[in-house]
């Protein structure tokens, strides 16, 4: 069984449990925070796969990586994953959960890149325009790239609009 199948199965189970408890939004926030922790701290994956670190220490590290307000469903999921010996797949499970959640919510991740911080009103207007034209809810992420001479770049999944 490959990493993708395992991650998807666990992510589906987590989404099902979270949906049943009506906390899928909170778990989504936890999974996004966890994913950011994996990106920010390259050694996190090494810690999770290190055999000299105990299961309870790994659980504590993952719970800290999910942020201060980690939901009980996420905590239980982390404990379950560690008990099943699948902790090395946690990053992929977090990514798959996000993907499944967005699909369920009919949401697309859109990245808005500009040379300077754009006013919130303009960001909202751009997000509304995308929602209207794409037929999806938009999760807008912003990036600042001073190398852009003017205008902005909008990345909607696999499409790019350079304006």
Where are these regions (language model features)?
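Elongated, mostly alpha-helical coiled-coil "stalk/stator" tethers of large membrane protein machines
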Residues: 1-163
């Amino acid at each position: 069984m490959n990493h993708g199948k395992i991650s998807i199965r666990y992510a589906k189970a987590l989404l099902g449990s979270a949906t049943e408890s009506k906390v899928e939004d909170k778990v989504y926030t936890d999974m996004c925070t966890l994913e950011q922790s994996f990106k920010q701290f390259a050694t996190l994956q090494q810690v999770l796969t290190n055999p000299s670190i105990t299961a309870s220490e790994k659980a504590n590290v993952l719970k800290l990586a999910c942020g201060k307000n980690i939901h009980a469903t996420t905590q239980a999921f982390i404990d379950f994953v560690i008990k099943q010996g699948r902790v090395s797949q946690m990053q992929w499970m977090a990514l798959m959960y996000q993907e499944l959640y967005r699909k369920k919510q009919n949401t697309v991740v859109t990245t808005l890149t500009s040379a300077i911080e754009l006013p919130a009103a303009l960001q909202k207007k751009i997000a509304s325009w995308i929602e209207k034209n794409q037929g999806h809810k938009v999760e807008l992420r912003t990036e600042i790239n001073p190398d852009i001479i003017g205008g902005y770049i909008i990345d909607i999944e696999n499409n790019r609009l350079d304006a």
